[in-house]
């Protein structure tokens, strides 16, 4: 069909009581698996890329690929800037046709976070681009940004309302105990905090760091207002481990078209499970 923005997609999720998964892609194979699986399950999905991914693949190349695959599979897709921090970088990609942005200024003091985010919102809304921002900060690593667990902090529900009203954002990423990367042990999510945030903020809420969360935890966050679930590390790990296993078992393999099939199969299992956990099958 066409490349769309996240605003209507997440508003539909909020009304319908499900979440839309955002999968961070890193190469053609990741994109193929996400789109093919989503189309077969008739599920809305978001194609997310960090600054590193856009640098690796090229903005114009990614835009062309997403557009072509949306038409090929007759399936609405979103291409989303994940954890972008620089205004000029965001502006350039918006002018190239991107319609969904996450401006991450969560490392800044509250007032500066508002100022930085509002600048991006004011620009993006001129182009009908939806904007997500984060209040609170997750531990772990995303691209080249490393946040020590000791420096991570949770979203303040009262501040969340002020932040949403002052910036004009379309969705809010919250920090309730998740982290980027995989978990050494199951995280203790602060569900009461999430419920409180929901009472103060009527925007679609976003959960980053969902790789490795249990089905039960994911579905509980959705009941409490999460409308977008971000998954990155789980896909990378599935791809990498399957590829390592295949090449160990088949050291003579030299054709990427052959040995990448095992990696795609492993990722397909992850994507289908996340879609099922989010309750969005049949919602596209």
From Swiss-Prot:
E.C. number: 4.1.2.40
How does the cofactor attach, per the note? Binds 1 zinc ion per subunit.
* Main EC class the enzyme belongs to: lyase
User: In which residues is Zn(2+) bound?
Assistant: 83, 180, 208
GO MF terms listed in the record are: tagatose-bisphosphate aldolase activity; zinc ion binding
Say yes or no: keyword RNA-binding present.
Answer: no
Q: Quickly give the catalysed reaction.
A: D-tagatofuranose 1,6-bisphosphate = D-glyceraldehyde 3-phosphate + dihydroxyacetone phosphate
Question: What Pfam families would the database entry show?
Answer: F_bP_aldolase
GO annotation terms (biological process): D-tagatose 6-phosphate catabolic process; galactitol catabolic process
Q: Which cofactor does it need?
A: Zn(2+)
- The residues the record assigns to binding dihydroxyacetone phosphate are 181, 209-211, 230-233
Keyword Metal-binding assigned to the entry: answer is yes
Pathway(s) of this molecule: Carbohydrate metabolism; D-tagatose 6-phosphate degradation; D-glyceraldehyde 3-phosphate and glycerone phosphate from D-tagatose 6-phosphate: step 2/2
Q: What are its GO cellular component terms?
A: cytosol
Catalytic residues (UniProt) = 82
Its keywords, alphabetically, are: Galactitol metabolism, Lyase, Metal-binding, Zinc
Function of the molecule = Catalytic subunit of the tagatose-1,6-bisphosphate aldolase GatYZ, which catalyzes the reversible aldol condensation of dihydroxyacetone phosphate (DHAP or glycerone-phosphate) with glyceraldehyde 3-phosphate (G3P) to produce tagatose 1,6-bisphosphate (TBP). Requires GatZ subunit for full activity and stability. Is involved in the catabolism of galactitol.
Quaternary form?
Forms a complex with GatZ.
UniProt record similarity statement: Belongs to the class II fructose-bisphosphate aldolase family. TagBP aldolase GatY subfamily.
Q: Which NCBIfam families does the protein's record reference?
A: cbbA, PRK09195.1, PRK12737.1, tag_bisphos_ald
PANTHER family cross-referenced by the UniProt entry: D-TAGATOSE-1,6-BISPHOSPHATE ALDOLASE, D-TAGATOSE-1,6-BISPHOSPHATE ALDOLASE SUBUNIT GATY-RELATED
Protein name, UniProt field: D-tagatose-1,6-bisphosphate aldolase subunit GatY
Name the gene that codes for it.
gatY
């Amino acid at each position: 069909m066409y490349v769309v923005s996240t605003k209507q997609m997440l508003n539909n999720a909020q009304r319908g009581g499900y979440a839309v998964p955002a999968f961070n892609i890193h190469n053609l194979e990741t994109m193929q698996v996400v789109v093919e699986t989503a189309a077969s399950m008739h599920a809305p999905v978001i194609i997310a890329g960090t600054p590193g991914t856009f640098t690796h693949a090229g903005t114009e190349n990614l835009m062309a690929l997403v557009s072509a695959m949306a038409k090929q599979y007759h399936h609405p897709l979103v291409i989303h800037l994940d954890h972008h921090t620089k205004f000029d970088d965001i502006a350039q990609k918006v002018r190239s046709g991107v319609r969904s942005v996450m401006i991450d200024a969560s490392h800044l003091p509250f007032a500066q976070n508002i100022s930085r985010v509002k600048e991006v919102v004011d620009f993006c809304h001129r182009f009908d681009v939806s904007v997500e921002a984060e209040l609170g900060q997750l531990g772990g690593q995303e691209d080249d940004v490393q946040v020590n667990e000791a420096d991570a902090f949770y979203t303040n529900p009262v501040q969340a309302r002020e932040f949403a009203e002052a910036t004009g954002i379309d969705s809010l990423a919250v920090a309730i105990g998740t982290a980027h990367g995989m978990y050494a042990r199951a995280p203790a999510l602060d569900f009461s905090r999430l419920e409180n945030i929901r009472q103060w903020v009527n925007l679609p809420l976003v959960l980053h760091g969902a790789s490795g969360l249990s089905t039960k935890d994911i579905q509980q966050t959705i009941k409490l207002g999460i409308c977008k679930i971000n998954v990155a590390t789980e896909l990378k790990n599935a791809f990498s481990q399957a590829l390592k296993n295949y090449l160990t078992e088949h050291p003579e393999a030299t054709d990427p078209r052959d040995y990448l099939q095992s990696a795609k199969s492993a990722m397909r299992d992850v994507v289908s499970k996340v879609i099922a956990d989010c309750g969005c099958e049949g919602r596209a």
